[in-house]
Amino acid sequence: MTALSEQAVDYNLLKNRFRGFFPVIIDVETAGFNAQTDALLELAAITLKMDENGLLVPDEKCHFHIQPFEGANINPESLKFNGIDIDNPLRGAISENVAMSELFKMVRHGQKKADCQRSVIVAHNATFDQSFVMAAAERTKIKRNPFHPFSIFDTATLSGFMFGQTVLVKGCQVANISFDGKKAHSALYDAERTAELFCYMVNHLKKLGGFPHVAINS
């Protein structure tokens, strides 16, 4: 790319910031670590947009409590960790099929609005969340999965690079983002904090003059 064409790119447009990718924050709570056998119990997603100053900010969100799929493994230790009572009727849990359909609908709408080509999962320790989303998509056989099959943005890695901290609460503390440990392991709360952290890192790099990148001659 020539210097002239580089200057012509408007990086205040989301479609140009991540090479056509539409970033979507995801957080899941599960009944174990194996996406193929263990139940997906809760999912939250937050789309992002550029504001009038070209800064990345949260946009739309969705949040679902999900019924274990038929034959799913339920690990009691996982339920003790995330505090989910799968038998509580007040959960208002819905089927994986409905949850994934609504998730994909929201993501495709945001992706189209931003004129992006593909969506990418942004999560803390993202391979875990991605594995459960993809496994649920495969089980429900919903067509037109908007997410890239393997590319991800992992905020644990990015936070380690930016701040030397890989734990979500630690990264938030460095970025001066409030974090209530009592609310942690709620998919929606963790997704909201992850969205704030990701936006902070992207915007901070821009404010420092690190993006768009200009190579330094050695």
UniProtKB/Swiss-Prot annotation:
Query: From what organism does this protein derive?
Result: Histophilus somni (strain 129Pt)
Tell me where the signal peptide lies.
none
Keyword set includes RNA-binding: no
Protein name, per record: Ribonuclease T
Residues involved in Mg(2+) 1 binding: 27
Gene (UniProt): rnt
User: Which E.C. number(s) belong to this protein?
Assistant: 3.1.13.-
Q: Where is the active site?
A: 185 (proton donor/acceptor)
Any one biological process term the GO annotation gives: tRNA processing
Task performed by this protein: Trims short 3' overhangs of a variety of RNA species, leaving a one or two nucleotide 3' overhang. Responsible for the end-turnover of tRNA: specifically removes the terminal AMP residue from uncharged tRNA (tRNA-C-C-A). Also appears to be involved in tRNA biosynthesis.
Return the similarity comment. Answer: Belongs to the RNase T family.
Q: Which GO terms describe its cellular component?
A: cytosol
Which NCBIfam families does the protein's record reference? Answer: RNaseT
Site Important for substrate binding and specificity: list residues.
Answer: 33, 81, 128, 150
- Top EC class for this record: hydrolase
